[in-house]
UniProtKB/Swiss-Prot annotation:
Function comment: May be involved in the biosynthesis of 6-O-methylglucosyl-containing lipopolysaccharides (MGLP). Regulates host peroxisome homeostasis in response to intracellular redox levels to favor mycobacterial infection in macrophage. Induces the expression of host peroxisome biogenesis and proliferation factors as well as peroxisome associated enzymes. Inhibits the induction of host pexophagy mechanism by down-regulating the expression of pexophagy associated proteins and adapter molecules in infected macrophages. However, during increased oxidative stress conditions, it induces degradation of dysfunctional and damaged peroxisomes.
EC number: 2.3.1.-
Alphabetized UniProt keyword annotations: Acyltransferase, Repeat, Signal, Transferase, Virulence
Gene Ontology terms: cellular component: peptidoglycan-based cell wall; plasma membrane
Transmembrane feature ranges: none
GO molecular function: acyltransferase activity
Listed SUPFAM superfamilies: Trimeric LpxA-like enzymes (SSF51161)
Entry keyword Acyltransferase: yes
Alphabetized CDD domains for the sequence: LbH_MAT_like
Secretion signal span: 1-25
Name of this protein: Probable acetyltransferase Rv3034c
Entry similarity comment: Belongs to the transferase hexapeptide repeat family.
Length: 300
């Protein structure tokens, strides 16, 4: 059960996953004092209380009974693994080698420890992966055939974090969610990348930055996007379909569909769609030449 009253507004849809922008996303500011008072009020009134604004919270140390209390095992999006269809797939694809068996075991342990996290299909987990979602405050949904490499850290402190199908994460990536992050289908992420949907406030020089609260804005990463090594994606970013983010880019704002963006801050330097359309004649000539070669081979 989500105790945050975030609200929603209409959004766009990438693939099969609806993308919604929570109300007040650009002005989601909380302070440490407000957070403490709200959490005390929540502890006194129980899990049915509504928080007026989201405090800074952490999920580390959440006891197992809290995770099971927020279980989503009956959610229709939750995949069922021990079925005849899954057994047929394992046999048909010979997915019973040691590599697969280790990952089945990791997924089983993960599901038993995190029944409040939605997995819509098979998820392949590497070594040392940390996936956290605050029970009753955050919703984490992982799509089908997602590969999460070694030592990735995925934290849904609050709000919503959604992975599409066939997402591939390299190693040592960090994703921090306090409001709303969506990663579309078939996104390819290299190593040592960072994605977050919040910033620390730093306006008041008389108050420590850690006590000034945070500002939150949603992040959208479109399907079929390639994120290079050591890329940072900051709050309030919308990345279109089929984009390429060059290594070490710092991305903030809107990146149009099929763009190649590089630099810090990231700037669009090329459009893949325009390049593809411009090379149509060249591709046609190449196809005709190959067809002519095959025709001559067949005539011999």
């Amino acid at each position: 059960m989500n105790v945050l009253s975030l609200g929603s507004s209409s959004g766009v849809v990438w693939g099969r996953v609806p993308i919604t922008a929570p109300a007040g996303a650009a002005t989601g500011v909380t302070s440490r004092a407000d957070a403490h008072s709200q959490m005390r009020r929540y502890a006194q009134t129980g899990p049915t209380a509504k928080l007026s604004s989201a405090p800074m919270t952490t999920m580390w140390g959440a006891p197992l009974h809290r995770r099971w209390r927020g279980s989503r095992l009956r959610d229709p999006r939750q995949a069922k693994f021990l079925t005849l269809a899954s057994l047929k797939w394992v046999l048909a694809n010979r997915a019973y080698t040691p590599w697969y068996l280790v990952r089945y075991w990791r997924l089983l342990r993960f599901k038993l420890a995190n029944p409040h996290i939605i997995t819509r299909g098979m998820v392949f987990l590497g070594k040392g992966v940390e996936i956290h979602a605050t029970p009753e405050l955050a919703q984490l949904e992982i799509g089908r055939w997602v590969h999460i490499g070694d030592k990735n850290t995925i934290r849904a402190h609050e709000g919503s974090l959604r992975f599409g199908d066939k997402v591939v994460l390299g190693r040592d990536n960090v994703i921090n969610t306090y409001l709303d992050i969506e990663i579309g289908d078939s996104v390819l992420m290299a190593d040592w990348c960072y994605i977050c949907d919040f910033d620390h406030r730093m306006d008041d020089i008389t108050l420590p930055i850690k006590d000034q609260g945070i500002i939150k804005s949603p992040v959208r990463i479109g399907p079929d996007t390639w994120i290079g090594v050591k890329v940072s994606v900051l709050r309030g970013t919308t990345i279109g379909r089929g984009c390429v983010l060059g290594s070490h880019a710092v991305v903030r704002g809107a990146i149009p569909d099929y763009s190649i963006a590089v630099g810090a801050p990231a700037k669009v330097v090329k459009n893949r769609q325009l390049s593809w359309e411009a090379s149509a004649a060249q591709r046609a000539e190449l196809a005709a030449a190959l067809a002519d070669i095959e025709r001559k081979k067949a005539a011999r």
